[in-house]
Regions:
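Short loop/turn segments that connect beta-strands within beta-propeller blades
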Residues: 85-89, 125-130, 207-211, 270-274, ...
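Short glycine/acidic-enriched loop and turn motifs that connect beta-strands
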Residues: 69-73, 163-166, 253-256, 304-308, ...
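Hydrophobic or amphipathic alpha-helical targeting/insertion segments
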Residues: 112-169
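Beta-strand-rich domains and repeat architectures in extracellular enzymes and scaffolds
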Residues: 43-79
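Predominantly five- to eight-bladed beta-propeller fold
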Residues: 21-28, 78-79, 161-215, 219-220, ...
Length: 731
């Protein structure tokens, strides 16, 4: 579905005259791409404006959000700010800066906004239809990546960095300023795409003096990171409504313990005394704390088991009181004990918590729970969209509630939307932004449907099918089977700028997206089955989906493509598919499980999913094996290649590299050299193996990219190589 044209006409007419007062040299604006044949291309994908981070004004009447635009020739994107009424009318662009603006936040009086630009915090007055002159209000030499204003905006918490555990040559000898090296004596020396030469820290400062001299480090002398790397931001901290307390999530571990443990605790920092009160410090990930409206309750997302990064995401609730002037935890309870899926992105509204979750329909929905754990789904089960957590909730007439959120589907990227509900029943939804309608209306639209297939063990597997525009079942089409990353994730109504299924369909391919074992929308048993069984049932699920597609009378050739765990799946299926697939594409995949164990950074993932399945345990000071087959160097390593656990033994024995003598199908291997999650040598090894077996193969390595391909021209090259390979072997 594409929304009606009315919103686009308002927006485009406005942008021609309702402009901010100044356009900086180097500004990147909306694309004016013209499409004559209705076919989406990789250039079209890069032309879309990308909406993010909507923020409602204090009076609830306006919404401020950012949009990123891309300039392929300049090889960069730039994010600027837009403002509209809460219903989407009177849209105007209020910044046209040459460098990106992020983390835009309203002042409590609604008359100005704060934001980050070039690593510092700025403030600008908002008057009428334009943004006034911005003024830098921070001076932090190490830069600021995120922040949160206190409720009264007299103070601010901000995120910056301090020197990390990894040393460089000048730490050894200041005269060695031309030497290049990284020096470490412990694990966790690199993370995601960077060497840990810096550690993020969170500070509190008065709004009038945002500088090191007037800032207080929340962690004091503790040697930990806050927020948690690599993706944590200010959402991991929350001011209490009275501004006296800050709740935060922190993994209070370093080195080997950090590398093997997922234990992130919840803490409360008292700003007056500088005292930290632990709320919950056991188990796995505890993240995203949010206070209720009067500061008497704190909710957060919690995983029960330490070492399992894909454990069920529960909603925990703590009752908070005051004793001797400090916050005290009275009780903690779970609100989702009877909910068999993951909860995400909590938002309070009165005595209810709204959240999002993947559902058995293969879509993401908005739900709510009361304080007794009674959960109801608010978005209609028949709506084939992914809805995200609300950014604003407003009581409406006749007892109804309007939920302002974001959504997308396979056919369009993120837009702002209002969902109206009454009690537990959905009433309607209305799209309130139309950022990309001028592009979408030029494109022919694919169609999608949900199907269910019977698996080899008699269960039902939900799959999405996406058909090219003007699909004609009397004709023959090439097809693509998507093998999912994660491995814990879901093929949903997802619109991605890296793996865009609509783009695949618009190149004339039928796209099959099976939700095999390990996906997250179908309950814990379905999700957890994959841990310790990488070579097993989920591979049979993929073969079931592939055989179904290949049997369709309108399907000719079939490709199999995937990234990360999907790349592992490609390498595995290459060795056992027979003649089902006509070509393969792997991006950032695991090829050699043993090599992966010794080179990845987040050891908890490999430890658990290779068959460890026991909680984190560590005894410092031990050297070598304990003799129990799972403990080495004092660390429980039941998923290691030298462990004796049956699942680990099987995983390494059946690693994709052990099946290369069966390889015979053309394969393309992508990898980024800055990928420290699945190091790029995995891609080199897979390509080398294909070459040694005489298999038609190609290798594309990106020296500056991580697990994802981000830079515009690299993205364009990736897509050109991707479709060139598909077309060569499937058309």
């Amino acid at each position: 579905m594409v929304a009606g044209l009315g919103g686009y006409l308002i927006a485009s007419a406005f942008l021609s005259f309702m402009t901010p007062s100044k356009t900086e040299k180097g500004y990147i604006g909306p694309s004016e791409i013209k499409i004559e044949d209705g076919v989406m291309t990789p250039e079209t994908l890069l032309a879309f404006g990308r909406i993010s981070d909507p923020q409602v004004s204090p009076d609830g009447q306006k919404v401020l959000y950012g949009v990123s635009y891309t300039d392929i020739a300049k090889n960069r994107s730039c994010r600027n700010l837009f403002l509209s009424n809460i219903d989407g009318t009177e849209l105007r662009q209020i910044t046209r800066y040459a460098s990106s603006v992020s983390c835009a936040r309203w002042a409590p009086d609604g008359k100005s906004i704060y934001f980050i630009q070039d690593g510092q915090i700025w403030k600008a007055p908002l008057g009428g239809k334009t943004l006034g002159a911005r003024r830098q209000i921070s001076n932090v030499p190490s830069g600021i990546s995120d922040f949160k204003l206190s409720p009264s905006a007299d103070r601010i918490l901000y995120i910056s960095t301090v020197p990390g555990p990894v040393k460089t040559p000048t730490d050894v000898d200041p005269a060695l300023d031309k030497a290049q090296a990284y020096i470490t004596e412990d694990l966790m020396y690199r993370h995601w795409d960077h060497w840990v030469t810096e550690t993020p820290r969170t500070y509190i400062a008065p709004i009038a003096h945002i500088d090191p001299e007037h800032s207080t480090d929340i962690l004091g002398s503790e040697p930990y990171e806050l927020p948690t790397e690599p993706f944590g931001g200010a959402e991991q901290l929350d001011w209490s409504p009275d501004g006296k307390l800050i709740a935060y999530s922190c993994r209070k571990r370093t080195g080997k313990e950090y590398a093997f443990s997922t234990n992130c605790g919840i803490y409360i920092y008292d700003t007056a005394s500088g005292t930290t009160i632990p709320v919950k410090t056991d188990g796995g990930y505890d993240t995203d704390p949010v206070w209720n409206e009067d500061g008497t309750r704190l909710a957060w997302i919690s995983m029960e088991r330490d070492g399992y990064e894909a454990d069920r995401q529960r909603i925990l609730l703590a009752d908070i009181s005051t004793l001797n002037g400090l916050p005290t935890v009275q009780s903690i309870k779970e609100l989702t004990a009877n909910f068999d899926n993951d909860a995400n992105s909590l938002v309070w509204h009165g005595d209810e918590i709204y959240f999002s979750s993947m559902r058995p329909t293969g879509t993401q929905a908005i739900l709510k729970t009361d304080m007794q754990g009674r959960i109801s789904q608010l978005t209609n089960k028949d709506w084939a969209y992914d809805f995200f957590s609300p950014w604003y909730i407003q009581n409406a007439e006749n007892g109804a509630v309007d939920i302002y959120t974001t959504y997308y589907c396979l056919n369009f990227p993120v837009e702002l939307v209002k969902v109206s509900v009454n009690g537990d029943a959905s009433l309607d939804f209305k799209q309130i932004s139309h950022e990309n309608e001028h592009i979408l209306k030029q494109l022919d639209t694919p169609t999608s449907e949900s199907i269910h297939l019977k698996t080899v063990d008699g269960q039902q597997m939900q799959c999405w099918m996406l058909y090219p525009p003007h699909f004609d079942p009397s004709k023959k089409y090439p097809a693509i089977e998507i093998v999912l990353g994660g491995p814990q994730g879901t093929n949903s109504q997802d619109f991605s700028y890296r793996w865009c299924y609509r783009l695949m369909a618009q190149q004339g391919y039928i796209v099959m997206m099976p939700n095999r074992r390990g996906t997250t929308a179908f309950g814990q048993e379905w999700k957890e089955q994959i841990s310790g069984d990488y070579p097993g049932l989920n591979m049979q699920d993929y073969l079931t989906a592939g055989r179904y597609v290949k049997s369709l009378p309108y399907v000719d050739k079939l490709a199999c493509v995937g990234a990360s765990y999907g790349g592992y799946s490609v390498y595995m299926l290459e060795g056992l598919h027979g003649d089902l697939y006509d070509c393969f594409i792997a991006h950032a995949g695991i090829f050699n499980e043993r090599q992966m164990w010794f080179t990845t950074e987040e050891m908890w993932f490999a430890n658990w999913d290779n068959g460890g399945l026991t909680q984190f345990a560590y005894t410092p000071g031990e050297v070598g094996p304990r003799g129990d087959g799972i403990t080495f160097g004092g660390m429980q390593q039941a998923g290691a290649p030298y462990a004796s656990t049956p699942k680990a033994v099987r995983h390494y024995a059946e690693s994709p590299d052990m099946k290369v003598t069966n390889w015979h199908t053309p394969i393309l291997c992508f990898h980024g050299m800055m990928d420290f999650r699945i190091p790029y040598e995995q891609g080199l090894a897979a390509f080398n193996a294909a070459q040694m077996m005489g298999v038609p193969s190609k290798l594309v390595i990106f020296p500056e990219e991580n697990h994802w391909i981000i830079r515009p021209q690299n993205s364009l090259l990736w897509h050109k190589e991707f479709y060139s390979w598909l077309d060569k072997w499937c058309k």
